[in-house]
Amino acid sequence: MTHFRLEQVADGAWAAIAASDLATGNAGLVDLGGEMLVFDTSWTPVAARELAGLGPVRWVVNSHWHGDHVLGNQVFEGATIVSTRATRELIATRDAERLAGLRQELETTDDVPPEIVEAVAEIEPRLPDEVFDERRSFGRAELVTYGGGHTSSDAFLHLTDAGVLFAADLVLVRSHAWMGDGHPQAWLGILDRLAGLDFDVLVPGHGDVGGRSDLDDFRAYLTDILAAAEEHGAHAPIPERYRDWAFEDGWARNLAFLTGRR
């Protein structure tokens, strides 16, 4: 695979870890017994085609509305796409706005790699076909939402028979979060509920496959940055433990968001 690194996390379940600029968000694949479920579709059709080519895909899940997890939807012809009701509405509105802005930006920028320009030109947003409110079962896979934390509506996939949690952007591994569309206190509450689930393997929305300790580390990150914003404001220094995390500009960006809300 060119755009993902495939890692088996259980019998019949794989993490697709983003490995190129055309696939910046992780995805997941679950064999439901002769048909495949794909969890999140990355942000470009060219990357999503790698996922679609791994088996007969019957179901696609959109965990939340951010484009790096849903703009590959269009390539899954014949599959049913599922999201929360709120996520579907946000894909229809917010993603459309952001995609239009990105295309306008590319028209006035000369230093963007041609493969990015071509990928963006190909995107045709596709909305989820079905919605759910709290929980949806796909046999061994339970699709659940506890409401909004990272965004106004976030879903995760729990393989109850294998102890695997596909957390999407509710949990990142050694990566700074994007908090700009989030609800931090609700997010912390969701993380506490996730910690109560039976899992040993964590597939994050960004970063490598991890485990329970990575959920603890990410919860500590949110707690620490909330405290830093409260005590020191937008210029709070980044703690040593987070300086080598991915998306290094995220600390300052998140502080700006948190202090700007006051």
What is each PLM-predicted segment?
Residues 111-113, 196-201, 209-262:
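Accessory terminal helices/loops
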Residues 35-45, 92-220, 224:
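Metallo-beta-lactamase
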Residues 65-110:
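A generic, well-ordered mixed alpha/beta core segment in the N-terminal half of proteins
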Residues 14, 61-63, 80-82, 130, ...:
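Hydrophobic/aromatic beta-strand patches that form the interior of the parallel beta-sheet core
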Residues 7-9, 30, 134-139, 204:
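Short acidic-hydrophobic surface loop/beta-edge motif
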Residues 4-51, 155-168:
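Conserved beta-strand hairpin/beta-sheet module of binuclear metal-dependent hydrolase folds
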